[in-house]
From Swiss-Prot:
Its main location: cytoplasm. This is Eukaryotic translation initiation factor 3 subunit I. The keyword ATP-binding does not apply. One of its GO terms (biological process) is formation of cytoplasmic translation initiation complex. The lineage of its organism: Eukaryota, Metazoa, Chordata, Craniata, Vertebrata.
Length: 325
């Protein structure tokens, strides 16, 4: 399985995301550019330039018309996917940590960091109402006084958002009323990443407590646990098989103070039903920060602390593989 190596960032990758068709791969890093690549051959299609700080998150809508990015320059920006033109600049008081389009692509949500005396907020803006963008006035802002949001995704049908917090809590916020519909605490440390399954019925979390867990999207019921011996930075669910892929590794500042075993940086494949690991893919020099499955399930990509993105196309053996418990 020879990867395609994408070199378009000078700093470590923060998030990677495929569009729904899977022909484009969007990557952001701790440098100010948002890159878009052809996923089939790794050719760079272009960049979205405008941010002046590290970009923490990126999302693309259902029909690949708009791209959303959130950055440490205290702004969330909306781009025209095809031309790279900036359509909207939404300024905030602190860094934008997570962002996302709802199912229809009409409503965006983004969350800001708790820093410099400012509270963590989740903001919702309806793109059909130009005054909300011009006046930078979200139709709803939910304060998170307890613990800041470190990852968030839209739930099924755009009815709510699922947010993971620094203290390991998972909250479900209603996109209509802003109330907390559901709240659980299955992780003991920060939740680094949340990704939903293709049909939005389940989602998988990745946490600093060295586990990744599978939950029901509607009830937040805990289904499965995938254990590792190092912090998990990202996890993704295969759209065609009962597989999840986990990526992580020790933070750069802790590497010298821990045993060498924890410093390993492979992508690890687990079977969902049996919670068993069945494969590993080496490659990155440093921790893996973000993972994404291609929507057709025939390849996956990983972005690492080394600033590279790798696109891996699975070998034929992967598709013939039968898991025996």
């Amino acid at each position: 399985m020879r990867p395609i190596l994408l070199q378009g960032h000078e700093r470590s990758i923060t998030q990677i995301k495929y569009n729904r068709d899977g022909d484009l791969l969007f990557t952001v890093a701790k440098d100010p550019v948002v890159n878009v690549w052809y996923s089939v051959n790794g050719e760079r299609l272009g960049t979205y330039s405008g941010h002046t700080g590290a970009v923490w998150c990126v999302d693309v809508d259902w029909d690949t018309r708009h791209v959303l990015s959130g950055s440490a320059d205290n702004s969330c920006r909306l781009w025209d996917c095809e031309t790279g033109k900036q359509l909207a600049l939404l300024e905030t008081n602190s860094a934008v940590r997570t962002c996302g389009f709802d199912f229809g692509g009409n409503i965006i949500m983004f969350s800001t960091d708790k820093q410099m005396g400012y509270q963590c907020f989740v903001s919702f803006i309806d793109l059909r109402d130009p005054t909300q963008i011009e006046d930078n006035e979200p139709y709803m802002k939910i304060p998170c006084s307890e613990s800041k949001i470190t990852s968030a995704v839209w739930g099924p049908l755009g009815e709510n958002i699922i947010a993971g917090h620094e203290n390991g809590e998972l909250n479900q916020y209603s996109a209509k009323s802003g109330e907390i519909v559901n709240s659980i605490k299955e992780h003991s440390k920060q939740i680094n990443d949340i990704q939903t399954s293709r049909d939005m019925t389940m989602f998988v979390t990745a946490s600093k407590d060295c586990t990744s867990k599978l939950f029901d999207s509607t009830s937040l019921e805990h289904q499965k646990t995938f254990r590792t011996e190092r912090p998990v930075n990202s996890a993704a669910i295969s759209p065609i098989y009962d597989h999840v892929v986990l990526g992580g590794g020790q933070e750069a500042m802790d590497v010298t103070t821990t045993s060498t075993r924890i410093g390993k940086f492979e992508a690890r494949f687990f079977h969902v039903a049996f919670e068993e690991e069945f494969g590993r893919v080496k490659g990155h020099f440093g921790p893996i920060n973000s993972l994404a499955f291609h929507p057709d399930g025939k390849s996956y990509s990983s972005g690492g602390e080394d600033g590279y993105v790798r696109i891996h196309y699975f070998d034929p053996q992967y598709f013939d593989f039968e898991f025996e418990s």
